[in-house]
Amino acid sequence: MFVSATLPAALVAGVLASPAAAALSARQDPCTALGAGASSSLTYTFQLEVANASATDSAASGTLALMNGSSDGLWWLKEIQQNSTGTFSGWTLQSGALIPTPSSNDSGLVGSDMPVPLGSIIQFAVTNNGSANAGAGQTPYCAVSDAGGQAALAVNGDANSFAVCQAPSLDWVLVYAASSDNNGTYTFDTCEQHYIYLTQA
């Protein structure tokens, strides 16, 4: 009796530990739940462009650049109005990781995306030792197609909750699900909802 009761448990454990089960779970893409055309990877390098959600067209109003922004060494996505993109010249999306591409003269830097809680500024850890941050990749980013066929950025399964808000430094920073409860990192009354487009560089 004991043998027959343990056999099904052993079979289940064996199946779950098999390479086929591991491959199946590795192939599951969390972005597919967002509908047809959603993906956790793109084959091209792109710029992050912002478009005001209340505008009648989807024309970009600015570009986001990764800039050193906080006293704890984390870098923020900030809206810029000039052609320069700063230390990082573009972006890639690989298996849900949003990866900044260093400009050629700053090739030693590595940027790693960080978890994105509600009400927070979008942050990245940037190191100059060539190693990624251990906390990276915990929040999957996705590319989703909007009604016009443009690739838009989504995080936490949501492409509609990005906002550009003014920080105390007077920089305009990218925020996810802006909230008045933000410990003074940005001024909530300045926030405007934006879509983030992944425009091929």
Predicted ranges, named:
Residues 75-133:
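Predominantly extracellular/secreted and cell-surface proteins with exposed
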Residues 69-73, 96, 170:
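Detector for glycine-centered tight turns/loop "hinges" at secondary-structure junctions
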Residues 1-29:
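Fungal secretory targeting signals
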